[in-house]
């Protein structure tokens, strides 16, 4: 059972007790992602994530690391397009310490200028690393041209230029605007006493000051058919198609999960069989739905030698056209549905997974979904629902494609393979 309450300052707290667990996972979620940023602030949410580990008024960065290591815990964070999560996974008896450390870094970070200057170099290196990975470059570019002009198309890391222009004081002001009680959720799952945790949450997070918050605008994709080529001196060309998807937790988003499994989400999927198993043209090939709060996208991707890039592109496009014309078989539907269900069950085997599920849905959906509720949504998907989303998702008029690698001489051939 999920318990929920709102602290006096407005922070929402959601928790789920798992009686058989020996550990506990606690997370703090903030409505702070790339969709929260202006062009000048691009990368600020991710940089803020880094800086909150760099010391508070009472703890140095080394103190934070040592305290968590001394209790055998794992302290980490991630930034996505719509939010940031800081979490600690610890043995159950150390929940108090985990909450104390998390609340301190979230509410009392110092943004020391010297730490900021050092960490800016770290963030720059992360951007450079991503720029060296053709799969990252291709996926980011496909997302950018698909959501052309919309904040969902912005990279979470930002750019070298935007990060280089940031100052410690400017980033601190961004943190103060985004990390306000109405934008925060605390989620906890594992073995703990619910009443004790309620008191602990109030004690650790109840002091956060109430400040005005900036709204996050709804997202949408403009539609249209676009292609982009990014030259990289790599052994492979990485190919990404980006197409329309659906908002999180909608019936259509669950139908798309099933369709994605049939297209490229498992070993028996169309693209895996046609491109890898039957022809040996690629090692990496797959598909992935990417839902957000108000809209979504769907990606199909592969990596292959430059001499085979056009053939792989043609095969990808041909399979998608065939599914658009003829749909998927009942056997593909049943396999795809059971794969979605089974993958979710396996993913939910840890307290951390439960913490993420209830925390993310509380932050973005303004309500909490249990494992059972999500499984019920999956079980309700019908083949008719999958057939209904196919013409929306696989509409060639809204297909965007990005290629990263040695693509200079092959641009015309790749365009022809796409039918562009």
Question: What do these predicted regions represent?
Answer:
Residues 1-23:
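N- or domain-start disorder-to-order transition segments that initiate the globular core
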Residues 3, 15, 209-211, 220-223, ...:
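A glycine- and charged-residue-rich anion-binding loop/surface
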Residues 6, 61-213, 229, 234, ...:
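Charge-rich, well-structured scaffold segments of protease-associated domains
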Residues 18, 27-29, 213-269:
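His/Glu-based metal-binding/catalytic segments typifying zinc-dependent metallopeptidases
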Residues 20, 25-89, 262-281, 292:
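M16/MPP (pitrilysin/insulinase) zinc-metallopeptidase core fold and M16-derived inactive scaffolds
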Residues 24, 192, 220:
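Active-/binding-site microenvironments in catalytic and ligand-binding cores
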Residues 36-43, 247-259, 263, 267, ...:
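Short alpha-helix boundary/capping segments
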